[in-house]
């Protein structure tokens, strides 16, 4: 008889575990989310035991009926882990034995270890979870694309080093936030190639001697393939680290978008206004409208980076094969998914609800002498070496700055004094509209290019949705 109630081991021990060990080992408070996957795997395992001749038809059918009943009770919340259950596996075995008896219920464990079991369940859960995250990321992409379509001709100051640089289209800038998220979703699609390998049948580490068929088990569980090496299958968690990286990267990309929104909605920038439903107020300052969603996006990005770093640190020095350290592999990943499932719809709603101050952005677009590059490139088109053109444009900025005027306000005489090549025809490029329209090379900010970029973003988003449905 086991000396360890609620666990799957104990016969070798003359005494049960200490209370401190039980408390330390317990994982049902976080691994219960794997319960539906555990039952699904147990159904497939029951059928595999039958095919291997280890169960007769009556035993197979009895186990499957018990598992079906247990699944219903788990789904409606009438079956939950007890304080004595060590983990999700122990809790579900207890529930099954309660329904079919110890003799029949005790047969299910043949040929499997918690090592291959949990590695498989984690992969099953994660393959579903990444699809939910990807769908949320694509909702943010849609919101960015819709705003870009709405503002196809809106001009704004483009910045580098947070200093005014060149005029660009707002659509161009918004789509620049969409592309990283599309790459993140592409990583999720690619990730599945490595996650979709079943460890089931690997046992504790050495494989099974009971005539089980890992390939058939993999197929039953929706995996394209079974693992090639049972030691690697039970010990590897690079799939979890890869997912944690993608989650952290999504959070970082959202954080960069959030930072723009925080700046744009400030009084000093005044580019955008927050919708009442997607912002908060102050407990003491009545006038405040705070970008809490964006600020929480910044904060949560740090949390997800920490989850990735913590998981990698857990993995870094473990010898093969399985070690109990791997109990710590799931919480960081579970948390990252949970945070993104909160954050992504909030960010999509925030972006979709932004109202842009088109007039202010247009007025600020030439500020900071953002047309200086256009002067230099106009001179290059006249045959002037770029080094000389750059010098002349810089001098024009210094002269205009000294007079407190814009580049377009310099007189013909002042321009000629700077460089004989600066004829009155240079005024063709001294408008923000002309500057933006001239950037018509692939990927540029010209309206024609921004329209193509919008088409590409929407097409890529639709293609990724189709891939995620496979």
Swiss-Prot record:
One of its GO terms (cellular component) is cytosol. Pathway: Amino-acid biosynthesis; L-arginine biosynthesis; L-arginine from L-ornithine and carbamoyl phosphate: step 3/3. Disulfide bonds: none annotated. SUPFAM superfamilies: L-aspartase-like. Signal peptide: none annotated. It is found in: Cytoplasm. It catalyses: 2-(N(omega)-L-arginino)succinate = fumarate + L-arginine. Its main location: cytoplasm. GO terms for biological process: arginine biosynthetic process via ornithine; L-arginine biosynthetic process. Belongs to the lyase 1 family. Argininosuccinate lyase subfamily. HAMAP family: Arg_succ_lyase. This is Argininosuccinate lyase. The gene is argH.
């Amino acid at each position: 008889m086991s000396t360890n109630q609620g666990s799957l081991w104990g016969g070798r021990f003359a005494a049960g575990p200490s209370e401190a060990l039980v408390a330390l080992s317990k994982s049902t408070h976080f691994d219960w989310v794997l319960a539906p996957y555990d039952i699904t795997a147990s159904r497939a395992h029951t059928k595999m035991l039958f095919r291997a001749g280890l169960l007769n038809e009556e035993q197979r059918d009895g186990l499957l009926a018990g598992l079906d009943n247990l699944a219903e009770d788990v789904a409606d919340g009438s079956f939950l882990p007890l304080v004595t259950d060590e983990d999700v596996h122990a809790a579900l075995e207890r529930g099954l034995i309660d329904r079919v008896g110890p003799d029949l219920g005790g047969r299910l464990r043949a040929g499997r270890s918690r090592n291959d079991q949990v590695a498989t369940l984690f992969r099953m859960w994660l393959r579903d979870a990444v699809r939910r995250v990807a769908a949320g990321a694509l909702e943010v992409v849609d919101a960015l694309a819709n705003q870009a379509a709405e503002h196809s001709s809106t001009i704004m100051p483009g910045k580098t080093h947070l200093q005014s640089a060149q005029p660009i289209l707002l659509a161009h800038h918004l789509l620049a936030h969409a592309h990283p998220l599309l790459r993140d979703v592409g990583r999720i699609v690619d990730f599945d190639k490595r996650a979709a390998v079943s460890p089931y049948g690997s046992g504790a580490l050495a494989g099974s001697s009971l005539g089980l068929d890992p390939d058939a088990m993999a197929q039953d569980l929706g995996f394209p393939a079974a693992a090639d090496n049972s030691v690697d299958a039970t010990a590897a968690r690079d799939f979890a680290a890869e997912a944690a990286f993608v989650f952290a990267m999504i959070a970082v990309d959202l954080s960069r978008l959030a930072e723009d929104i925080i700046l744009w909605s400030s009084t000093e920038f005044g580019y955008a206004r927050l919708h009442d439903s997607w912002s908060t107020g102050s407990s003491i300052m009545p006038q405040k409208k705070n970008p809490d969603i964006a600020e929480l996006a910044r904060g949560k990005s740090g949390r997800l980076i920490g989850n990735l770093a913590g998981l990698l640190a857990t993995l870094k020095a473990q010898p093969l094969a399985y070690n109990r350290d791997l109990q710590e592999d799931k919480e960081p990943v579970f948390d990252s998914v949970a945070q993104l499932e909160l954050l992504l719809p909030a960010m999509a709603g925030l972006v979709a609800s932004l109202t842009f101050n088109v007039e202010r952005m247009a007025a600020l677009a030439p500020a900071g002498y953002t047309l200086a590059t256009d002067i230099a490139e106009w001179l290059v088109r006249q045959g002037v070496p770029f080094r000389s053109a750059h010098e002349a444009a810089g001098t024009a900025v210094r002269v205009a700055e000294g007079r407190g005027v814009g580049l377009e306000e310099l007189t013909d005489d002042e321009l000629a004094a700077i460089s004989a090549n600066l004829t009155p025809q240079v005024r063709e490029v001294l408008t923000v509209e002309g500057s933006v329209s001239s950037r018509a090379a692939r990927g540029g900010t010209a309206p024609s290019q921004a329209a193509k970029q919008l088409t590409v973003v929407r097409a890529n988003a639709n293609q990724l949705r189709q891939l995620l449905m496979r």
